[in-house]
Amino acid sequence: MPLNFRDRFNVPVLKNGEEVAYLVGNSLGLMPHKTRDYVNQEMDAWSQLGVKGHFVSGKEDLGQDVHQGPWYSCDEPLHGLVGPILGASEDEVAIMNTLTSNIHSLFSAFYKPTAKRSKILFEAKAFPSDTYAMEAQARLHNLDPSEALIKLAPKDGLHTLSDDDIIKVIEEQGDEIAVVFFSGIQFYTGQLFDIPRITAAAKAKGCVVGWDLAHAAGNVPLKLHDWNVDFAVFCTYKYMNSGPGGIGGLFVHDKYADDQRPRLAGWWGNNAETRFKMLDEFDPIRGARGYKQSNPSVLCVLALRASLELFKEAGGIEKLRERSIELTNRLLKGLLASPHYIAPENIEIFGNSGKAWFTIITPQAEHQRGAQLSLLFGPDGTMKKVFDYLDDHGVLGDERNPDVIRLAPAPLYNNERDVDLAIKLINDSINLINGSA
């Protein structure tokens, strides 16, 4: 069932005024109308209150509330909004920093290599920033990344990792693995990993388990607490529509809520009651918020709040997932029916005809993907031609060189027209390339 929230967002338009089919919420979500209102309100508060905005609403000086609340606590309402999206309590989440910095923050607290258990297991084709972070963490502990990192790659001829293969490595090498750290949804292929199963296997071998949920948070329902995940990081500018470079977040399981483990501490993780007393001794807030470091950007926080309120109004992540499945299934069905589609197992047979073609490298089963489908085009040079044609005719997707276009219907603002237009234009563009238009 349509959720009818499209008119709550700013949808880009073509020169003729027609709305584009924006299928790239997996890269940057659209801006809710409310975001501009919230941000402008805080700009007004800054201009009228100055530094007092940290502690007052404006009523004391101006006779009326002029913003969403004191900046000192502006992020507090977000924990209750994002918790249900992650399957976490308010105390298990913190809105802070950005994704890679949060990876480093949590690895500093949870990656404790020993002589017997020092390795990190993750994807060979992880998002580059994750790879850089893993290599940096190894070096920070005076370890050789080539020895400390187990980079697990798909089998020859495949684009995705098997959950079974991941678990096999955990069972065989788990006694040497300190941290298992995968992406919930793989950024390139769109594969959704079996988070609870992989987590359980790793925990059974004594490993710490973390997840990069950049492409999973706000996309698929998660149950991080129930799955016994140790920690996780996420960004909010994709499916949670917080804006370019939007604030990130992290999850730390409640079983660590009262532990005083060393961390990259900062004053915003200190007990709020004594924070401004400027005491020398660090007294961490209970739970994930004890990992905060600096006061967050008010404008980024309010941009995220505007979108999270729409998540709640729409009925939550489970309701959005139902709509997401409808839209992505429609996209998948239309693409599979294309005369230019070649099944992955048939590419060697039919992919060398000289004609343009595409396949889908995202798993087709609903439980193995989120909103995104990744289309691989051939021969070389086809993807760019198709991408430019889509862009010129009102479909925005995401190109990943050398040969992939990612399309991701977002349930809050995409509709059947967007999906059907993408299917039509992909077929039209390949017809033109092949000279059969």
Swiss-Prot record:
GO terms for cellular component: cytoplasm. Its main location: cytoplasm. Its cofactor is pyridoxal 5'-phosphate. GO terms for molecular function: kynureninase activity; pyridoxal phosphate binding. The keyword Hydrolase applies. Gene3D superfamilies: Aspartate Aminotransferase, domain 1 (3.90.1150.10), Type I PLP-dependent aspartate aminotransferase-like (Major domain) (3.40.640.10). Pathway: Amino-acid degradation; L-kynurenine degradation; L-alanine and anthranilate from L-kynurenine: step 1/1; Cofactor biosynthesis; NAD(+) biosynthesis; quinolinate from L-kynurenine: step 2/3. It is an enzyme of class 3 (hydrolase). Disulfide bonds: none annotated. It comes from the Eukaryota. Its EC number is 3.7.1.3. It is found in: Cytoplasm. Pyridoxal 5'-phosphate binds at L99, T100, F127, P128, S129, D130, S183, D212, H215, Y237, W267, N295. Keywords: Cytoplasm, Hydrolase, Pyridine nucleotide biosynthesis, Pyridoxal phosphate. The keyword Cytoplasm applies. It catalyses: L-kynurenine + H2O = anthranilate + L-alanine + H(+); 3-hydroxy-L-kynurenine + H2O = 3-hydroxyanthranilate + L-alanine + H(+). PANTHER family: KYNURENINASE. Homodimer. Catalyzes the cleavage of L-kynurenine (L-Kyn) and L-3-hydroxykynurenine (L-3OHKyn) into anthranilic acid (AA) and 3-hydroxyanthranilic acid (3-OHAA), respectively. Belongs to the kynureninase family. This is Kynureninase. The gene is BNA5.
